[in-house]
Amino acid sequence: MSLLDHKFGQGGIVVSQLEDVLNWARLSSLFPMSFGLACCAIEMMQTFTSGYDLDRFGVIPRPSPRQSDVMIVAGTVTFKMADRIRRLYEQMPEPRYVISMGSCSNCGGPYWEHGYHVVKGVDRIVPVDIYVPGCPPRPEALIGGFLKLQEKIRKETLVAPKAVERFLETHAKEKNIA
């Protein structure tokens, strides 16, 4: 007799929270959209080859932002590209996550001091969830970033406190109108 049979009897019922089930589904099916801008993109492409087999983690690359829930920004972000990155981020469905890969996208890299054309970190454009350090980071580092993102998703709650506040404010406004 297994532990579950002993605990729940013969009914075959497993008790869980909805948050746990949704988070498990989210972390088990990450669909990244790659946004490669420089030499970090080569390492990112290598990470998606069969040698590293990201499918076993549930990570399957998608070509469109509308099908993705993770954006990987890899490389030097210039001011000309900033608007495009923001637009692609806004096209992604919620919940959406961003991985910043490499020194250039994290903080401007070697161009941070004298490069007038370089954004000093992609976090000035879009909110970043995971930073992967390195110049360029190895594929193992990006895999580690995906694992950290999965841990972050596992700990998420179904409703964020700000969303609750926004709902209550909207509900109060609707009450005043009616």
UniProtKB/Swiss-Prot annotation:
It is an enzyme of class 7 (translocase). GO terms for biological process: aerobic respiration; electron transport coupled proton transport. Its main location: membrane. Its cofactor is [4Fe-4S] cluster. GO terms for molecular function: 4 iron, 4 sulfur cluster binding; iron ion binding; NADH dehydrogenase (ubiquinone) activity; NADH:ubiquinone reductase (non-electrogenic) activity; quinone binding. Keywords: 4Fe-4S, Cell inner membrane, Cell membrane, Iron, Iron-sulfur, Membrane, Metal-binding, NAD, Quinone, Translocase, Transport. It comes from the Bacteria. [4Fe-4S] cluster binds at C39, C40, C104, C135. GO terms for cellular component: plasma membrane; respiratory chain complex I. Its EC number is 7.1.1.-. It catalyses: a quinone + NADH + 5 H(+)(in) = a quinol + NAD(+) + 4 H(+)(out). It is a peripheral membrane protein. It is found in: Cell inner membrane. InterPro entries: NADH_UbQ_OxRdtase-like_20kDa, NADH_UQ_OxRdtase_20Kd_su. It holds the Pfam family Oxidored_q6. The keyword rRNA-binding does not apply. NDH-1 shuttles electrons from NADH, via FMN and iron-sulfur (Fe-S) centers, to quinones in the respiratory chain. The immediate electron acceptor for the enzyme in this species is believed to be a menaquinone. Couples the redox reaction to proton translocation (for every two electrons transferred, four hydrogen ions are translocated across the cytoplasmic membrane), and thus conserves the redox energy in a proton gradient. Belongs to the complex I 20 kDa subunit family. NDH-1 is composed of 14 different subunits. Subunits NuoB, C, D, E, F, and G constitute the peripheral sector of the complex. This is NADH-quinone oxidoreductase subunit B 1. The lineage of its organism: Bacteria, Pseudomonadati, Bacteroidota, Cytophagia, Cytophagales.
